[in-house]
Design a protein with these regions (language model features):
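C-terminal ends of transmembrane helices
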Residues: 19-24, 88-100, 128-135, 178-182
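Loop-to-transmembrane alpha-helix initiation sites
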Residues: 122, 138-146, 157-169
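Interfacial segments of multi-pass membrane proteins
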Residues: 45-48, 67, 71-76, 90, ...
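Short, non-helical or kinked segments that cap or interrupt transmembrane helices
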Residues: 29-38, 97-110, 137-145
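Alpha-helical transmembrane segments of multi-pass membrane proteins
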Residues: 10-15, 86-91, 128, 132, ...
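Nucleotide and nucleotide-moiety/phosphate-recognizing core
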Residues: 2, 6, 52-97, 119, ...
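N-terminal signal-anchor transmembrane alpha helix
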Residues: 1-27
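Cytosolic, membrane-interface loops and tails of multi-pass inner-membrane proteins
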Residues: 20-53, 101-102, 182-202
């Protein structure tokens, strides 16, 4: 596959709104009208339980991993980075949702880094798990994990292009969590629960 073809594939795969599709298929509802309105795994877990939510999380991760991995191993490292960035852009503004608001990029960005810079991905995953375990805030875990991306990029001495991707990804994830940050400041952010119930805003 060509450089341009893989970047296009990245955007198309990133545009697959798995949370929206799976909830439509298995529950007959619009996830955008439930809980926080997000199409990502966190909102799906809160509203419909772990099985459906974790499935969404895995698929959202894979749609970032696949184009990034293919680009790195079959074209060039830069292709993998740009294909991964395209997947994140697709997740944010999905073609299949007519470019309306998508997800917050956390799982998809994780998949991208597993495809292009696995040690960064592993480090960020550890940060997410530890932070979530201590706080039970998915938003705080995601923000801390995002902040750690460029740190791990420097620690493991990755290329300039990977470092740039880490900064861009961190900024994007933090920016997309700005409403969560506001709720954290006012003490109205909700801690995560795996109980099957309708989601409170996050």
């Amino acid at each position: 596959m060509t450089f341009a073809g893989l970047v296009l594939l990245g955007y198309v795969l990133g545009s697959c709104p798995w949370g929206y599709w799976l909830v439509r298929i298995f529950r007959g509802e619009d996830i955008r009208k439930v809980g926080s309105g997000g199409i990502g795994a966190s909102n799906v877990v809160r509203a419909y339980g772990r099985t459906l939510g974790f499935t969404v999380g895995i698929l959202d991760t894979l749609k970032g991993f696949v184009p990034a991995f293919l680009g790195v191993h079959y074209v060039s490292p830069l292709c993998g980075i740009l294909a991964g960035a395209a997947a994140m852009a697709g997740h944010y503004r999905p073609l299949f949702l007519r470019f309306q608001k998508g997800g917050k990029m956390v799982a998809t960005a994780g998949g991208v880094f597993f495809g292009v810079a696995v040690f960064i991905a592993l480090g960020a995953a550890v940060v997410w798990l530890v932070t979530f375990g201590l706080t039970r805030y998915a938003s705080v875990a995601s923000i801390c994990s995002a902040i750690s991306l460029p740190i791990w990029a420097f620690v493991f001495d990755y290329s300039t292009s990977v470092i740039v991707l880490s900064f861009v990804s961190a900024f994007a994830v933090i920016f997309l969590h700005r409403a969560n940050l506001k709720r954290l400041r006012t003490g109205t952010e909700n801690r995560f629960s795996l109980r099957l119930r309708r989601a409170a805003p996050q």
